[in-house]
Amino acid sequence: MSTRTPLPTVNERDTENHTSHGDGRQEVTSRTSRSGARCRNSIASCADEQPHIGNYRLLKTIGKGNFAKVKLARHILTGREVAIKIIDKTQLNPTSLQKLFREVRIMKILNHPNIVKLFEVIETEKTLYLIMEYASGGEVFDYLVAHGRMKEKEARSKFRQIVSAVQYCHQKRIVHRDLKAENLLLDADMNIKIADFGFSNEFTVGGKLDTFCGSPPYAAPELFQGKKYDGPEVDVWSLGVILYTLVSGSLPFDGQNLKELRERVLRGKYRIPFYMSTDCENLLKRFLVLNPIKRGTLEQIMKDRWINAGHEEDELKPFVEPELDISDQKRIDIMVGMGYSQEEIQESLSKMKYDEITATYLLLGRKSSELDASDSSSSSNLSLAKVRPSSDLNNSTGQSPHHKVQRSVSSSQKQRRYSDHAGPAIPSVVAYPKRSQTSTADSDLKEDGISSRKSSGSAVGGKGIAPASPMLGNASNPNKADIPERKKSSTVPSSNTASGGMTRRNTYVCSERTTADRHSVIQNGKENSTIPDQRTPVASTHSISSAATPDRIRFPRGTASRSTFHGQPRERRTATYNGPPASPSLSHEATPLSQTRSRGSTNLFSKLTSKLTRRNMSFRFIKRLPTEYERNGRYEGSSRNVSAEQKDENKEAKPRSLRFTWSMKTTSSMDPGDMMREIRKVLDANNCDYEQRERFLLFCVHGDGHAENLVQWEMEVCKLPRLSLNGVRFKRISGTSIAFKNIASKIANELKL
């Protein structure tokens, strides 16, 4: 086994003092001679109440996994929200570390408006921090759960962006290998952001890859057959499954277990819904071709009639990456005001070091989606120069000035400016804080319960993050929205309801044939044609089955045969890295995951939840560890009463306004206070414990403490934008989708609003 060069030793309290090498690793850059004066003026002073990493104030934990967690954070210098993936390197073996740094290297070279952007990499002796773009709109998966299938016009807009981004990866000789609905995120303007490059790899023309990974319902037939492949063709098949899913709301290939699913994929037969257009059907036939040689390429598919319908004068073409704009004087002047010198700015940007300087420059060029329209004209509200209580800082940010939600914009349109290009005009009146040279130690990160509600106000925008990447399991996609799972009796109009509902799939590792000539040698982080990747099982991918009929709800969240799998040549007892979550925002706070193994594909769910670790089986699954509630046998701090002091504090509070009404479960013209009383009444009637976090926000728990039926969720009364109505927002924090649907539907149906 190859060994990686020992990592440089870094003081855990100086996590921001790093510059990056091209291979994704870091070296320490001493800034002690420059830090003194700036630290005195820094907004993140040593007495800062909230924990922070480098220049980022941590708001809350939005995902957890075996070896990593994801935190929602705010960049102190610019006020932009980011997602930080915190990976414990001490739990990874050398092979896993190679894969981790390969993923980082790949993300550094990707620069497309529909791919989640990496801003900064911070490395210490024990920990790797990936600072990434926060996609506040959540997952496409959750959008489909809430709305059912998309109309073809909407699906086309989304799909054009997806094809543009994947084709861009292919032209850079990168294959994603884990394309699925939960790895497609939406930003504040409902544009696609592809996430999770944990399974990605570089390919060469004429070379073959042999790592069998992906989510079974989206996996190409050659992967089920154990054949070697070039690379792009497996992504093309997955795109066909995604297109079918967008248009129909269900999967083209599904089964009660992995064996049945495999048989259906290898047959290549799928049902064409009556409402699907002929052009869309013909396009699917170019994607879902059993013979990979005859499968269409994305360059060919970009010219397809369905893809370009309504865009005749704007035919989808391969994305031309614009030259990086590293000389935006307005941004540079702002950074000089923060305390950076012209020389170090030019040095960092010319080499794209992905250090704190690169991150600050990129973030200054991005639209501030957090700024409230009412604050946008007030320079005093935008000023971050003075140290203020965190609640004041965050409450000055709220809705985006762009109240009108733009539907997806075609990728082939003139690409909007984003991080690496001259970003939107930066108001000259905005005063930015001096840079900070302080950071919290890793020990601060052990605080799992960092609450962002009171500290961040409405800055989070009600959006959370969603799990998807293998290593993090339920803590992988940092960008899941607050969209409740669909109820069994869907309230979505039948004309827009999919024939099959959406259910999340678990991720697992599938072992492959072991041969004597297969060695676990990774050279330069690449995979040889005889070397399969080795990853820990993933823990939260999605499956799609009917949400309307109970007999078809076979796979709740965590079902193994609905999951991302990864080929492995032999048993490994050391922890292997499956890749950190790819996008910067994760929704519910997932509990840590551990590994279990099971041999067959029958009764997968029961084996998944087994508390035993089986090391002699062929398939590996991840099971959920007990939550804090389960370990203690009770919910700490649960209360059904609101203190008088709390009432006084919140007397003037008003419900926050959500930009997206599709995450609302119930709407009413009732007074928000009366709605809260009704909610508490129904929760009491259903034996739910709850804690009032804010005047209009409840943290709820239901179940007897067992992993199978314990559900935690939030209920919040929110104002619907531009309407004289309030709504109740349901957001699942933990528990299976089926258990959440059951209790959420029951409560929603009993509310008299």
UniProtKB/Swiss-Prot annotation:
Serine/threonine-protein kinase. Involved in the specific phosphorylation of microtubule-associated proteins for MAP2 and MAP4. Phosphorylates the microtubule-associated protein MAPT/TAU. Phosphorylates CDC25C on 'Ser-216'. Regulates localization and activity of some histone deacetylases by mediating phosphorylation of HDAC7, promoting subsequent interaction between HDAC7 and 14-3-3 and export from the nucleus. Regulates localization and activity of MITF by mediating its phosphorylation, promoting subsequent interaction between MITF and 14-3-3 and retention in the cytosol. ATP binds at I62, G63, K64, G65, N66, F67, A68, K69, V70, K85. Keywords: ATP-binding, Cell membrane, Cell projection, Cytoplasm, Disease variant, Kinase, Membrane, Nucleotide-binding, Phosphoprotein, Serine/threonine-protein kinase, Transferase. It is found in: Cell membrane; Cell projection, Dendrite; Cytoplasm. This is MAP/microtubule affinity-regulating kinase 3. Residues 56-307 form the Protein kinase domain. Residues 704-753 form the KA1 domain. Residues 11-28, 645-655 have a biased composition (Basic and acidic residues). Interacts with MAPT/TAU. Interacts with DLG5 (via coiled-coil domain). Interacts with STK3/MST2 and STK4/MST1 in the presence of DLG5. Interacts with YWHAB, YWHAG, YWHAQ and YWHAZ. Interacts with PKP2 (via N-terminus). Interacts with CDC25C. Interacts with KSR1. Its main location: membrane. One of its GO terms (cellular component) is dendrite. It is an enzyme of class 2 (transferase). The gene is MARK3. Ubiquitous. Residues 326-365 form the UBA domain. Pfam families: KA1, Pkinase, UBA. Residues 1-36, 370-600, 632-655 are annotated as: Disordered. It comes from the Eukaryota. Phosphorylated at Thr-211 by STK11/LKB1 in complex with STE20-related adapter-alpha (STRADA) pseudo kinase and CAB39. Phosphorylation at Thr-564 by PRKCZ/aPKC inhibits the kinase activity. Residues 391-400, 490-513, 521-548, 584-600 have a biased composition (Polar residues). It catalyses: L-seryl-[protein] + ATP = O-phospho-L-seryl-[protein] + ADP + H(+); L-threonyl-[protein] + ATP = O-phospho-L-threonyl-[protein] + ADP + H(+). It is linked to Visual impairment and progressive phthisis bulbi: An autosomal recessive, progressive disease characterized by poor vision at birth and development of bilateral phthisis bulbi by adulthood. Its EC number is 2.7.11.1. GO terms for molecular function: ATP binding; protein phosphatase binding; protein serine kinase activity; protein serine/threonine kinase activity; tau protein binding; tau-protein kinase activity. Residues 374-385 have a biased composition (Low complexity).
